Amino acid sequence: MTIFNAVDKFTMMSGDRVKIKDLLSSRLTECGWRDEVRLLCRSILQEKGAISSFTVEQLVTEVTPRARSLVPDAVKKELLIKIRTIFDENEDDDIDPEDA
């Protein structure tokens, strides 16, 4: 099991997954990331607009790596700290991320 999968299952079982998603969503909105990605999508659609067979899946495939690279380091760091805090707070609980 990968670390990502272990963290995902642990946060889902502990009920903290929604809190992390809400924090990420609000931070991405605050820093303007959502607007940047929206503009990126528009730009790609205008560029590929002549191609009638351009699908949503193709748009997602093209936008995803660029959108991920646009996430500010401060947001990534804050989320990492939040996840570590959740693990530390639940360290003595019965939920073991390796068993998740």
Curated annotation (Swiss-Prot):
UniProt keyword Metal-binding present: no
Domain of life: Eukaryota
UniProt keyword annotations, A-Z: Activator, Chromatin regulator, Cytoplasm, mRNA transport, Nucleus, Protein transport, Transcription, Transcription regulation, Translocation, Transport
GO-annotated cellular components: cytoplasm; DUBm complex; nuclear periphery; nuclear pore; nucleoplasm; SAGA complex; transcription export complex 2
Pfam families to which the protein is assigned, alphabetical: EnY2
GO MF term (any one): chromatin insulator sequence binding
GO biological process, one term: transcription elongation by RNA polymerase II
Subcellular locations according to the entry: Nucleus, Nucleoplasm; Cytoplasm
InterPro entries attached to this UniProt entry: TF_ENY2, TF_EnY2_sf
Main location: nucleus
Recorded family membership: Belongs to the ENY2 family.
Record text on subunit structure and interactions: Component of the nuclear pore complex (NPC)-associated AMEX complex (anchoring and mRNA export complex), composed of at least e(y)2 and xmas-2. Component of the SAGA transcription coactivator-HAT complexes, at least composed of Ada2b, e(y)2, Pcaf/Gcn5, Taf10 and Nipped-A/Trrap. Within the SAGA complex, e(y)2, Sgf11, and not/nonstop form an additional subcomplex of SAGA called the DUB module (deubiquitination module). Component of the THO complex, composed of at least e(y)2, HPR1, THO2, THOC5, THOC6 and THOC7. Interacts with e(y)1. Interacts with su(Hw) (via zinc fingers).
Function: Involved in mRNA export coupled transcription activation by association with both the AMEX and the SAGA complexes. The SAGA complex is a multiprotein complex that activates transcription by remodeling chromatin and mediating histone acetylation and deubiquitination. Within the SAGA complex, participates in a subcomplex that specifically deubiquitinates histone H2B. The SAGA complex is recruited to specific gene promoters by activators, where it is required for transcription. Required for nuclear receptor-mediated transactivation.
Entry protein name: Enhancer of yellow 2 transcription factor
